[in-house]
Amino acid sequence: MYQLAIFDLDGTLLDTLADLRQGLNYALSTQGFAPRTLPEVRAFVGNGIRKLIELAVPAGTDEAQIEAVFEAFNPYYAVHCADFTTPYPGISELLRQLQADGVVSAVVSNKPDYAVKTLSAQYFPGLLAASAGAKDGVRKKPCPDAVFEVVRQLGAEALRAVYIGDSEVDVATARNAGLPCISVSWGFRDRDVLVNAGAETICDSMDALYRALREG
């Protein structure tokens, strides 16, 4: 069984899409830009908030306006990041079972670090040994920097670790970190995207994910 399970957050542990859309559309509105739909936001997420905004603004938007949208997003989202966000059904129970089995669980996300810390504490108190989000000086996924940071923080270099996520970014992150990857199909990417990214293990349910973790 794996000893350290490092999870992505958005689309893996939490369904955050509605709050991301709300925050994005608020920020876009400050510059007079049209709102984006839920399917559009679903397609844009995965590479951090700045990339989300770059994809969401109209083509040809200058850098100053992109920066203004980014600056509007963060204070709004800091207050509203949990308005509609919910854990995926069964995920809290899974984390509790892993804890009972002696597995250490952690989170590495491209979401802003303030939001990762807030949401992890609110929805999974006592269940995550460490969490790391996007912050200055640490390259975002698929670079493995934050994964290595969490492993060092936990003193877990000797543990058998696995990375779990819902996107092609997560598959690449695991590969770059030299870790096996378990992909989940209930998140923000369709199965064919995961397959095309090289996903080898794709779980469609919490039971399947638990089995994959036990077999690792």
What are these regions (language model features)?
Residues V79-V107, D113-A121, P144:
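Short, acidic loop-to-helix structural element flanking the phosphoryl-transfer center
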Residues I6-D8, V108, I164:
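Generic enzyme active-site microenvironment
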Residues A27-L28, G48-D62, L119, V150-V151:
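Helix-loop "lid/cap" segments that line or gate small-molecule binding pockets
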Residues R21, N25, L38, R42, ...:
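An amphipathic alpha-helix signature
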Residues E54-E93, D101:
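Metal-dependent phosphoesterase signature
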Residues M1-Q3, P39, Q99, D113, ...:
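Asp-based, Mg2+/Mn2+-dependent phosphohydrolase catalytic module
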Residues M1-A43:
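Active-site neighborhood of HAD-like aspartate-dependent phosphohydrolases
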Residues F7-L9, F73, V147:
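Conserved hydrophobic/aromatic "anchor" residues
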